[in-house]
Amino acid sequence: MKYYIYPCSSQKDAPYLIFSSGLGGHASFWNPQLESLSTHFNIVTYDQEGCHQDSALLPAHYHMCDMANQVLHLLEHLQIHEFHMIGHALGGIIGMELAKQLKSSSITMLSLTLINAWDELDAHTQKCFDARIALLASAGAEAYIRAQALFLYPPAWISQNHSHIKNTEDIQLQGFPPKTNVFARLKALMHFQLQ
């Protein structure tokens, strides 16, 4: 697993902040926030399992617990005993699952900030995921990636940021993971319910 540590620039004993990305799974999603937040925190970002072109295939019964375990193992490896966490969409759900697992651990999650996460999938999000799955299955990775902005952003923002979006999409296409991994991650995400 690839992970990245950005030490706090202003204090040696700063708290840790773990960033967890959405469905794309790449640590680089958080790059725009690193400069300002690393003045207050030691930041850790990571690439989620199965999100790279050369990734091993994920198991057939991949689950949110597996994604949370990845973070737990990272915390143990880095010997982080207390931390804050910010998760976007899937990353927030990983945080919720991790919080449940940490109840029986000596590691403490001090706070969890959720951005566009949910406790149970609603009908609109289900429809978006169904469309994305159909695109990937029927039309392939390029259609899946090129349509992604339509599910995420308002039209005016897309028009104003078209070049940036296209560059990002081109990069995503070059490193697109195995389809089965995308389907496994989507299935785990779609079946999550906070209990």
Question: Where is each model-derived feature located?
Answer:
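Structural signature of beta-strand start/N-cap positions in the alpha/beta core
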Residues: 16, 40-42, 81-84, 108-111
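Conserved alpha/beta-hydrolase "nucleophile elbow" surrounding the catalytic nucleophile
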Residues: 21, 83, 87-92
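Alpha-helical elements of Rossmann-like donor-binding domains used by nucleotide-donor carbohydrate transfer enzymes
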Residues: 29-32, 36, 66-73, 97, ...
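Active-site loop/oxyanion-hole signature of alpha/beta-hydrolase fold enzymes
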Residues: 35, 44-86, 97, 101
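Conserved alpha/beta-hydrolase catalytic His-Asp/Glu region
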Residues: 123-125, 142-195
